[in-house]
């Protein structure tokens, strides 16, 4: 188990000592490494459980140095954290758009979806604390989260966005930090 802090450009209690835009992208390039970037304490606990149970793969945690808002979840959502990605916000109907986020950007994405709902825009938010674990899920599960051929996808992460192209496709977009 490897633990990394300073997971993004976010400022924490220790000030602007380093803003790691490259850390997540670099870690995700390591073959066989599962990289977890949890959004809150429930996701952190689920990631720890997976790390303890894992006997075959190394695990890296990319933890925020900021205080993160706890995101309300159902029991089903909590159990789906271990799948690496799950629907954290959305009523289950056909969304107008899907936002995929990790870490501190999940609560921001949920807040944006709540504001857009007031304007009649239906947004599904996927929290994806671990891309590698999510990619090992069944096609049926992945299609429940992000339907195949769905074009209106936005990935949000405060780091280099290279690893999100495979999820947003050619018509999707990313909000990421490529330099600072």
Task: Give short role names for the model-derived ranges.
Residues 1, 28-30, 167-169:
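Alpha-helix C-terminal capping segments
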């Amino acid at each position: 188990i490897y633990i990394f802090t300073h997971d993004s450009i976010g400022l924490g209690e220790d000030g602007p000592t380093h803003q790691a835009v490259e850390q997540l992208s670099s870690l995700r390039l390591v073959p066989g490494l599962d990289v977890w970037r949890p959004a809150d304490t429930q996701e952190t606990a689920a990631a720890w459980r997976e790390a303890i149970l894992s006997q075959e793969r190394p695990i890296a945690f990319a933890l925020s140095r900021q205080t993160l808002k706890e995101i309300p979840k159902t029991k089903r959502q909590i159990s789906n954290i271990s799948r690496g990605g799950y629907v954290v916000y959305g009523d289950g109907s056909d969304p107008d758009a899907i936002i995929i986020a990790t870490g501190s950007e999940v609560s921001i994405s949920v807040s944006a979806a709540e504001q857009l709902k007031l304007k009649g825009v239906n947004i599904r938010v996927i929290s994806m604390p671990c891309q590698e674990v999510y990619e090992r899920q069944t096609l049926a599960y992945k299609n429940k989260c992000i339907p195949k051929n769905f074009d209106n996808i936005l990935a949000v992460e405060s780091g280099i966005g290279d690893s999100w192209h495979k999820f947003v496709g050619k018509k999707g977009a990313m909000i990421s930090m490529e330099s600072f």
